[in-house]
């Protein structure tokens, strides 16, 4: 007899179908349910399901098994390009007969300053060499953030940047270079392929807890009293009626 009514791996999906989670926008729920394989960073995939064993010439099945990666909290405040900590063990004195010791492999980190054309701001960010190479390949920070999917960014800071960029592109914010409209139009035209509706951009990069709080605040907005709605409608009707009726002009007698 099973211990649970539903398998454990289904609990998170079932949670999204109940309560306030079920009232979240459809595009946000789809982004949570999408499971994409991140780009391999710490291992090289075989690229095939079978290979020939050089010893006996037989075909053998091979499988790509990703190395477990631990992303510390500081990785969410920088751009590590998918790199993280690898937890493992090594032999003491490089001797297989001696005991094994715990070992943590960490990426080399650098602090660099980047400029965002869309946000018109400079950021000092902790990055890795892989991140610098990816930014160079994408021809700038903005293209790197907008092109890289969530599972490859692996950074809350990166997703917050993406949300800010998408919101500015969706709103065509005039606060960007207000003294130079031509430059502003050129920037918006340069990144127009990434523009999405503002209603979707507001939810990009939010965690489930942040999305639930946002939905709760939207639902708890103070309702407008009915008498204010009726008064506004009455005033509008009276204004339209006054404009539609012809004006009556009384002629005065010449002797008066």
From Swiss-Prot:
Localization (cell): Mitochondrion
Family annotation (SUPFAM superfamilies): L28p-like (SSF143800)
Tissue expression from the record: Found in a variety of normal tissues including spleen, testes, thymus, liver, kidney, brain, adrenal, lung and retinal tissue.
Biological processes annotated in GO: mitochondrial translation; translation
Segment annotated as transit peptide: 1-55
InterPro entries xref list: Ribosomal_bL28 (IPR026569), Ribosomal_bL28/bL31-like_sf (IPR034704), Ribosomal_bL28_sf (IPR037147)
Keywords, comma-separated and alphabetical: Mitochondrion, Ribonucleoprotein, Ribosomal protein, Transit peptide
Annotated Gene Ontology cellular component terms: cytosol; mitochondrial inner membrane; mitochondrial large ribosomal subunit; mitochondrial ribosome; mitochondrion
Chief location of this protein within or outside the cell: mitochondrion
Range of residues in the leader sequence: none
Family in the record: Belongs to the bacterial ribosomal protein bL28 family.
Stated name of the protein: Large ribosomal subunit protein bL28m
Lineage start: Eukaryota, Metazoa, Chordata, Craniata, Vertebrata
């Amino acid at each position: 007899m099973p211990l649970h009514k539903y398998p454990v791996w289904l609990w998170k999906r079932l949670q999204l179908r109940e309560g306030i989670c079920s009232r979240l926008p459809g595009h946000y729920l789809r982004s949570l349910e999408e499971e994409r394989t991140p780009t391999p960073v710490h291992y090289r995939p075989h690229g095939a399901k079978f290979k020939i064993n050089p010893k006996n010439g037989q075909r053998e099945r091979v499988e790509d098994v990703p190395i477990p990666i631990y992303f510390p909290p500081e990785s969410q405040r920088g751009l590590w390009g998918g790199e993280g900590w690898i937890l493992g063990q090594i032999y003491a004195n490089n001797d297989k007969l001696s005991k094994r010791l715990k070992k943590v492999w960490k990426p080399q980190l650098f602090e660099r300053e980047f400029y965002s054309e869309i946000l018109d701001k400079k950021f000092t960010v902790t990055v890795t060499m892989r991140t610098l190479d990816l930014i160079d390949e994408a021809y700038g920070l903005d293209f790197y953030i907008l092109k890289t999917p969530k599972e490859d960014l692996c950074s809350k800071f990166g997703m917050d940047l993406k949300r800010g960029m998408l919101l500015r592109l969706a709103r065509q914010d005039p606060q960007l270079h207000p003294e130079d409209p031509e430059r502003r139009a050129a920037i918006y035209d340069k990144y127009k392929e990434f523009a999405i509706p503002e209603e979707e951009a507001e939810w990009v990069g939010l965690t489930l807890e942040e999305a639930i709080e946002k939905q709760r605040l939207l639902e708890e907005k103070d309702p407008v009293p009915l008498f204010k709605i009726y008064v506004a409608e009455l005033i509008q009707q009276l204004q339209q009626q006054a404009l539609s009726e012809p004006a009556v002009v009384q002629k005065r007698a010449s002797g008066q």
